[in-house]
Amino acid sequence: MATINIRRDVKDSFYRYRMPKLQSKIEGKGNGIKTVIPNMSDIAKALGRPPLYVTKFFGFELGAQTTIIADMDRYIVNGAHDAGKLQDLLDVFIRRFVLCASCQNPETELSINKKDQTISYDCKACGYRGVIDGRHKLTGVIVKNPPAKKKSHKHKRDSPVAEEEDGAEDELTRRIRQEAAELPTAEVVNDEDWAVDTSEEAVRARVQELEGNMKDSLTLSDLRGDEEEAESSRYDQFGEWLEDNYPGVSDVEIYKKMKEENIHHKSKAIVVLVQCIITSPYVGEFEKHGALFKKLCTTDKHERALLGGFERLMENTELVHIDVVPKVLLEIYQNDLVSDDMFEKWGAKASKKYVSRETSKKIHEAAEPFLTWLAEASDESESEDEEEEEEDDDE
C-alpha cells in the first residue's frame, strides 16, 4: 500500500511519520451514489484517532451524511467525492485534531474533561499540553465518543505485589514442568490418519471440492412447495447447463437460456442460479451479476429466493466463509436486489425453507451486524422524514 508523509508539507523522504494514501471508491448511482473509503481504518490507526472521527469530519466539511459499519470496516460518505479532495480535507483534520501546536508532530493523545466538555491533548514528542478548538462540530462527536484509554502497567510492574505474582507464576511453571516430565511417554499416533488440515490451502481445496460436487445438491425436489416433477426436472437441467457452461457464458446468455426454458419468472430458478454462478468467497459476486439478478427479482418471492439461494450456497460449502455474510448482505442491499422490508422479514427468524434450521440460525447470527445497521439506518431515515414534515408544517 502506498504511503505518504502525515504532514504533506514536509518533503523529506525520510520523515518518520507516515500514513497510507487515502483511497476512495464510488458506488451506486443517482440519489444513492456514495463514496466508500476502503483504507479508512489504516489511516486512522496511523494518525492515532478512531475512524469515526475522520469519517464524521468529512461529513461535516462536505455537508453529507455518513455511514459507519465498524464490524465490516465500511466507512461511507454520501455523494461522489474523489480521493484528492478527501486527501485535502484529511490534511485539515490532521492540522486541527492531530498535530501538536508546539512541535507540529502527530504524537498527541486526546483526553476529555467531562466537567467543562473540553478536549485537551498531551504531546508525547515534546511534552506540550494544549486544548483543541471547540468551535468545530466534530468536537461534540469526540466528547460523546471519547478515545479509548490506554492501559498502563507501570505501577503494577514496580509494585511488590507484582513481584510476588511473578515469583508465584515461576514456581507454578516449574511444578508443571516437573510433573509433566514424570508422566509416562504416550504412544505416538500418526496425526495424518485423523487430523483435519486447517491450513488456508486445505480449506480452499475443500471448498472447491464441495462446489465441484454441488450438482447433486442442486436438485430442488426437496424444496417446499415444489411443482410437478416435470417442472422440477427443468430446474435440474438448467443447473446442469450452468455447471457445464459457466463461466464461459455471459449473464445475457444465461437470461436467454432461462427465457428459452420459460423459467425466467420462477423463484426456484433464482435459487439454482445463485448456487451455480456465485463463487467463493462471495464478496463482489452479487455486484458483478447485479443487472441479471435485478432483472429476475421482481417480487418479494423472488427476493426471498435469492436469499434462500445464498443460504443454500453457504450450507453446501459447510459454512466455510460464514464470516463474510454481513458484507455479502450489504452488497445485495446496496445493489437494490432485496428490499428493506424483505431483509426485515428474513432477519426476524430462522427458517428451514431452504436449509436446515440449525444452519439458518448460524447464518442469521453471522448476519447480526448487518441487520442491526439496517434497523438503525431505517430509524434515522424515519426520524429525518418526520423532521422535514415538521419543518414543512411550520412554514
Swiss-Prot record:
Entry keywords, A to Z: GTP-binding, Initiation factor, Nucleotide-binding, Protein biosynthesis
Key word Glycoprotein present: no
Family annotation (InterPro entries): ARM-type_fold (IPR016024), IF2/IF5 (IPR045196), Transl_init_fac_IF2/IF5_dom (IPR002735), Transl_init_fac_IF2/IF5_N (IPR016189), Transl_init_fac_IF2/IF5_Zn-bd (IPR016190), W2_domain (IPR003307)
A cellular-component GO term for this protein: cytosol
CDD domains, sorted: W2_eIF5
Record PROSITE patterns: W2
UniProt keyword Transmembrane helix, yes or no: no
Pfam family, one: W2
Gene Ontology terms describing biological process: cytosolic ribosome assembly; formation of cytoplasmic translation initiation complex
Composition-biased stretches (Basic residues): 147-157
GO MF annotation list: eukaryotic initiation factor eIF2 binding; GDP-dissociation inhibitor activity; GTP binding; GTPase activator activity; translation initiation factor activity
Ranges where the record places region Disordered: 146-171, 374-395
Binding residue positions for GTP: 28-35
Cystine residue pairs: none
Ranges where the W2 domain occurs: 228-384
Biased segments, Acidic residues type: 161-170, 377-395
Family: Belongs to the eIF-2-beta/eIF-5 family.
Its job: Catalyzes the hydrolysis of GTP bound to the 40S ribosomal initiation complex (40S.mRNA.Met-tRNA[F].eIF-2.GTP) with the subsequent joining of a 60S ribosomal subunit resulting in the release of eIF-2 and the guanine nucleotide. The subsequent joining of a 60S ribosomal subunit results in the formation of a functional 80S initiation complex (80S.mRNA.Met-tRNA[F]).
Subunit relationships: Monomer.
Protein name as it appears in the record: Probable eukaryotic translation initiation factor 5
Naturally occurring in which organism (per UniProt): Schizosaccharomyces pombe (strain 972 / ATCC 24843)
